Each structure stands twice: as C-alpha cells, then as structure tokens.
C-alpha cells in the first residue's frame, strides 16, 4: 500500500496495528510505570507497528495532567524510537489540548491523537476550528479521532475532508463502527485529492474490511491482548491477502466482541491481568469486570489461543 502517514521530523511510517494501550495500575489505582515499560517491550517484541498512549483504553479521563504527561514521557523513553508513539493529547478544551500536545512534541512523540471534543457538543465549524488551531499551534502530526459513541458530537465526512487540507493533519481514527461511513470517507478523500491522508479503523470488528477497502491500519483494543495476530491481520488486509485476513479475523472475532462486554477498558484490563501481563488496578468510576462475565471472556481468549 503506497499511502502511508509519516510523522514530521522523524519520518516514521504510521500504519498497521497500533494498540490503544491500557495504563497498568496497582490495586490502589496508582500507576504501575515498571509494568508499563514491560508491556511496551512485549508489544515491540510481538510486532505492534505503533503505540497509542493515554487514549480511551488508557483511562485518559481519570489520569491527572501530571500523570498524563509522565505516561507519554515514559512511553517515548521506553520505546526509544523502535516504533512510532502516538500520544493521546485531545480533549474538550482547545487550549488544554494544545498544551498537552506541546509536551508530547517536547518529549519526542511521533504524532498526537485528537479526539472530537466531548460534552460541550461543538458544531462542525467548531470542530474544524478546534483541530485547525491545534495543528497550527504545535509542529506535531495530528490524527483526528471520531468516536461518537463516547463524545456524542459526531464529525461529518465533509469536515474530515476539509481538515485533510490543513497542514499537519495526517489522518483519522474512525471509531464509528460503520463500514459504510469508513469506505465513503476513503473515497471522498481520494476524490478530493488527499491521497496522503490516512484512515485508521478504531473498531476491531470492522477493521479488516476497512483495510481491504483501502484503510491504513487499526488503532485497536484487541491488539492489547493479541498483538502478533493483529499485526498479521493488518499485514494481510493491507496487502489484499483475503484468505489470510479471513482466517485471522475468524480466529479473533469472539475476542473482538468480548472486549466490549462491559465498557472499555474493563474487559481488556481483566484479560491482560488473566494473561499475567499487568497488575489488577482500574480507577473509579470504572470497576473490575463483573464476575458473571469472566468465564465468557476467558472462553473467548482460549478460543483464540491467547490463554
């Protein structure tokens, strides 16, 4: 596939399987930085093509600004240039997003992930102005993040096409879960001449199909527990190997579904703890996985040969 997003400066290619990594915590809710370092090394060894830190799966709403910055710093330090680091620095305050993005740039992140502002429900023009301001304020590549199931505000395809023309905005994580919307967006971007703008899936169930239709990778929850398989899935789908894509997708489909039997990242953190990869902590208002759902999740992991 020739269309690849690149981070400015380092020119690292941003594509393929990028886990939206969890934030390891001790049972008292304090952050487990040694555990994070070990988890990052595991992802590199298992073939992950990039790391997204402090996103939805990383419990970004419940870490302090100081913790947010330290998570980015530790991740960049531990990865040490081996794969791209995409820092979740978005929010519903434009100025705060700019400040966090400045920090990410300073410590060496390769790009930023900027969520559609939530709660304050901006108009399409407000979204455009918000993302444009961030891109103009910090010399760090911006990946847009549309996840209307969480933000309520939903960025229209026309707005994405407009933003694709803003220097520094290099792609979007489309977490609408709509294959129709994703493929139409890819087509609209091509028709508008934005051939270097990347569309990443943010929905594991539909990611394989979106990549077969021209998507450039997957910012994934499932990749937290199956990094090698998700890397192989992205390679297969992006090289039009339909047979191998289908094989891996069916191996993982129960896991894709199980990752959302309760609100993300509750199931994925429980799964990683069960796999021996992280400590057991999670922060309120999120709570540990309901006991009645543990066996079904364990069964999905076993079905995919992850346990």
Curated annotation (Swiss-Prot):
Transmembrane regions: none
GO molecular function: 4-hydroxy-tetrahydrodipicolinate synthase activity
Enzyme class: lyase
Coiled-coil segments on the chain, per record: none
EC number: 4.3.3.7
Gene Ontology BP terms: diaminopimelate biosynthetic process; lysine biosynthetic process via diaminopimelate
SMART domains assigned to the protein according to its UniProt record, in alphabetical order: DHDPS
Subcellular compartments: Cytoplasm
SUPFAM superfamilies: Aldolase
Residues annotated to bind pyruvate: 57, 219
Keywords: Amino-acid biosynthesis, Cytoplasm, Diaminopimelate biosynthesis, Lyase, Lysine biosynthesis, Schiff base
Keyword DNA repair: no
Pathway the protein takes part in: Amino-acid biosynthesis; L-lysine biosynthesis via DAP pathway; (S)-tetrahydrodipicolinate from L-aspartate: step 3/4
Active site feature: 145 (proton donor/acceptor), 173 (schiff-base intermediate with substrate)
Highest taxon listed in the record's lineage: Bacteria
Keyword presence, Protein transport: no
Record's GO cellular component terms: cytosol
Reported function: Catalyzes the condensation of (S)-aspartate-beta-semialdehyde [(S)-ASA] and pyruvate to 4-hydroxy-tetrahydrodipicolinate (HTPA).
Quaternary structure annotation from Swiss-Prot or TrEMBL: Homotetramer; dimer of dimers.
NCBIfam families noted in UniProt: dapA (TIGR00674)
Similarity-based family: Belongs to the DapA family.
Name of this protein: 4-hydroxy-tetrahydrodipicolinate synthase
Annotated source species: Polynucleobacter asymbioticus (strain DSM 18221 / CIP 109841 / QLW-P1DMWA-1) (Polynucleobacter necessarius subsp. asymbioticus)
């Amino acid at each position: 596939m020739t269309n690849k997003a690149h981070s400015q400066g380092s020119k690292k290619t941003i594509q393929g399987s990028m886990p939206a990594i969890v934030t390891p915590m001790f049972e008292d809710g304090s952050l487990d930085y040694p555990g994070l370092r070990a988890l990052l090394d595991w992802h590199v060894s298992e073939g992950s093509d990039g790391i997204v830190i402090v996103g939805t799966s990383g419990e970004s709403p419940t870490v302090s600004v100081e913790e947010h910055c330290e998570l980015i710093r530790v991740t960049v330090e531990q990865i040490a240039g081996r794969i791209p680091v995409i820092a979740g620095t978005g929010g519903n305050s434009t100025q705060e997003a700019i400040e966090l993005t400045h920090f990410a740039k300073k410590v060496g992140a390769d790009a930023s992930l900027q969520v559609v502002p939530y709660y304050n429900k901006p108009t399409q023009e407000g979204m455009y102005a918000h993302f444009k301001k961030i891109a103009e304020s910090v010399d760090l590549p911006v990946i847009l993040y549309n996840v209307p199931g969480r933000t309520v505000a939903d960025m229209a395809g026309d707005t994405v096409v407009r933003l694709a023309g803003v220097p520094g905005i290099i792609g979007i994580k489309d977490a609408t879960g709509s294959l129709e919307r994703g493929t139409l967006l890819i087509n609209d971007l091509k028709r508008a001449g934005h051939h270097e703008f990347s569309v990443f899936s943010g929905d594991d169930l539909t990611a394989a199909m979106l990549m077969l239709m021209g998507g450039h990778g997957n910012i994934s929850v499932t990749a937290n527990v199956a990094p090698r398989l998700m890397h192989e899935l992205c390679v297969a789908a992006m090289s039009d190997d339909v047979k191998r894509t289908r094989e891996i997708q069916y191996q993982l489909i129960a896991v894709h579904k199980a990752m959302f039997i309760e609100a993300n990242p509750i199931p994925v953190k429980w799964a990683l703890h069960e796999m021996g990869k992280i400590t057991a902590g999670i922060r309120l208002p999120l709570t540990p996985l309901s006991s009645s759902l543990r066996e079904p999740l364990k069964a999905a992991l076993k079905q995919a040969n992850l346990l």
